[in-house]
């Protein structure tokens, strides 16, 4: 779909599409868990292989996910998206104006304004491709197409609310685990639930199977995000490159953070607060201190939460009447991987 879009919008006529081309690596580097859940779920519920129409419709989840990543990196001012430069930071390098370093009003400089502005436009293009994936899927009943578009809209509303909570957390010195889970379920979890709903809608599944698959997705998402946050803080072995300390420097409010604030002794908590979230002023010593406190007072608890959510996810999976047990095996393996994946 991206190739078709870019072919229809050559750089000679649409110069700003060069940034979309420039970020092609980011567009193709994802794990595609959401797409896998939707397609495998459909095949398991129907006992039939996913045809081209189903496969295309399910790609809306990955297009939408990319849309959120482009915007998330702007809001968090992240210069890297795991092993790649973030879209806005990549785009900023294209700015050749003599005023590149001149301070901006909203953005730090004219260069960063250019990069972020182009990334916002690219995000909107990618968001439109999510809708086009559903609209152009062949062989779908009109009612099914309408329900999928409705699911996308609902994801928009709930996920943006979760992102808003995440931004509000930046000003909170302490958050509770329950507050964190509400945010995570709305932000990360809602798109995974959308993947389960997509599978169920395409397969015309029963309400009980739909509910069980959505429950699987919800618990899977919580475990997935917790593992992501362990990797993003570098408290476990990871293969995500330089961004393994990014969450610490940026002061991300994760479950790790919530538990460390709650369970660390007063002296360790005070040192943690001083060293956490210092942005460009973060030093290797700050990062090392934060990691030590996270390992001593939060890591075991987060791993226990991951295991608990994986048990709940697998229990929900057992309740689904799949017609093809290869789906159960695949989703079980994806779930268990959240306890040990390195990237």
Regions found by a protein language model. Give the residues of each.
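All-alpha prenyltransferase/terpene-synthase fold signal
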Residues: 1-343
């Amino acid at each position: 779909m991206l190739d078709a879009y870019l072919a229809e919008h050559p750089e000679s006529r649409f110069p700003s599409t060069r940034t979309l081309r420039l970020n092609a690596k980011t567009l193709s580097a994802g794990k595609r868990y959401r797409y896998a859940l939707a397609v495998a779920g459909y095949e398991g519920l129907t006992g039939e292989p996913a045809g081209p129409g189903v496969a295309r419709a399910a790609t809306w989840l990955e297009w939408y996910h990319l849309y959120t990543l482009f915007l998330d990196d702007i809001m968090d001012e992240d210069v890297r998206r795991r092993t790649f430069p973030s879209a806005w930071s990549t785009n900023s390098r294209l700015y050749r104006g003599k005023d590149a370093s001149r301070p901006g009003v909203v953005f730090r400089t004219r260069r960063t304004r250019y990069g972020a502005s182009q990334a916002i436009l690219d995000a909107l293009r990618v968001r439109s491709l999510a809708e086009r994936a559903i609209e152009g899927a062949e062989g779908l009943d009109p009612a099914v197409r309408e329900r999928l578009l409705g699911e996308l809209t609902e994801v928009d509303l709930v996920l943006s609310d979760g992102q808003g909570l995440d931004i509000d957390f930046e000003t909170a010195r302490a958050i509770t685990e329950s507050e964190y889970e509400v945010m995570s379920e709305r932000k990360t979890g809602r798109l995974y639930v959308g993947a389960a709903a997509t599978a169920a809608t395409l397969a015309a599944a029963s309400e009980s199977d739909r509910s069980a698959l959505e429950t699987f997705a919800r618990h899977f998402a919580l475990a997935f995000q917790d593992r992501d946050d362990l990797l993003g803080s570098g408290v476990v072995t990871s293969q995500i490159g330089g961004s393994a300390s990014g969450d610490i420097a940026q002061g991300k409010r994760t479950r790790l953070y919530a538990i460390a604030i709650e369970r660390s002794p007063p002296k360790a908590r005070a040192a943690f607060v001083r060293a956490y979230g210092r942005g460009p002023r973060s030093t290797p010593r700050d990062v090392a201190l934060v990691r030590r406190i996270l390992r001593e007072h939060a890591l075991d608890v987060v791993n226990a939460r991951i295991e608990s959510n994986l048990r709940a996810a697998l229990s929900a999976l057992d309740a689904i009447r799949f017609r093809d047990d290869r789906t159960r095996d695949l989703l079980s393996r994806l779930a268990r991987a959240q306890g040990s994946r390195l990237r």
